[in-house]
Amino acid sequence: MKYLTVGDLEDCLLNKVDLRRQQISQAVEEVQKVVHHLTTNISNQDIRFQAVPYSDTYNENIKVLAPSQFLVTVPIKGLAGYREAREQHWRYYTLQGTRLPCPLRDPEGLQQWLEVEQFMKSLWQWHETDVNIDGDIVPAKVLLVFRKLVENAVRTCHLSGKVSLLGNRSAVWVAVETSAYQVELELVPAVEIPTTWSKKARWPRCLQRWPSQERVECIKSFGFNLLACSNYHWQLSFLRAEQVLLEQLDEDGGCRRKCFQVMRHLKEDIWCPGNRPVITSHHLQTVLFWTCEKYPHFKDWQVFSKAFLRLVRKLHKCVSQHFLKHYFVRNSNLFQCTNPTELDTVAQKLATFLKNPQIGPP
């Protein structure tokens, strides 16, 4: 069994982390060709959905949550000039068109309503009853339309042998066969809101020392997305802002990214393996951001072993408490809908690791 030494770090990074990067890059390359083909067909069927572009470098529409689990955001077209809702009002509708005696619950944390009137410009199709109820663009109805378009696209593009729609899920999931293994994709329609920062994201906090104020303004300029992944409420997402923050971690020469990469490798190989793990790369990324904020100085990230174990202790604390705040929207818990038993299993593995830190299985 190996202990955390400089030599082990080099071995882990070169032989494990780099190998993972190559495998993931190959999978992303194959997946994005399929996604571009599918979404181009979908866009031709319905102007409200935009094709996911093909990219030779980083594709901001594809987020790797685990080696075999990707999140793919499909841009929504025909909604421009977003503004925050001016006033709140009760909703009494159902997805079936009946009226409720009591109002629907208000959105919490990362959720919000979305009214078509919140946009200065909108295609007339967004006012149609297939996606709109009482002026609200309803994510469940958008997903229903989108799922049918995906089904048609799989048939039309002759991808039935390579792509299969996964049923019995409220979201739209497809399985894609790559040359190495099967990857499950969650295809999520997304309203992209560039240059505007959500009022729900009260960030940064007062007296926060990381990142710098200049970097904060840069990150906020990337805006946010609204994802259609529930019945009535849209979910806030900051994928672009998070990616920029992740890319610019170590300008001072620290080892933050190395710590993250090794932690992700151990999570995927030992602590929480599997196709749809309870802990994803996004959770690890959030733990990293919180730790960087608490330890903002270069001196805190000079020695890998100390910095890495500090990061793992933070992860263990969050998993044990079943509580991980979103980095930008702090009144939300990213573990709220996760399986507590699975979290406890991961917490036990992390506790064992921290008692005797090792970078590989027996």
Swiss-Prot record:
Pfam families according to UniProt: Mab-21, Mab-21_C
Gene3D superfamilies: 1.10.1410.40, 3.30.460.90
Entry-linked InterPro entries: Mab-21-like_nuc_Trfase, Mab-21_HhH/H2TH-like, MAB21L/cGLR
Family membership: Belongs to the mab-21 family.
Descriptive protein name: Protein mab-21-like 3
Protein's organism: Homo sapiens (Human)
Encoding gene (name): MAB21L3
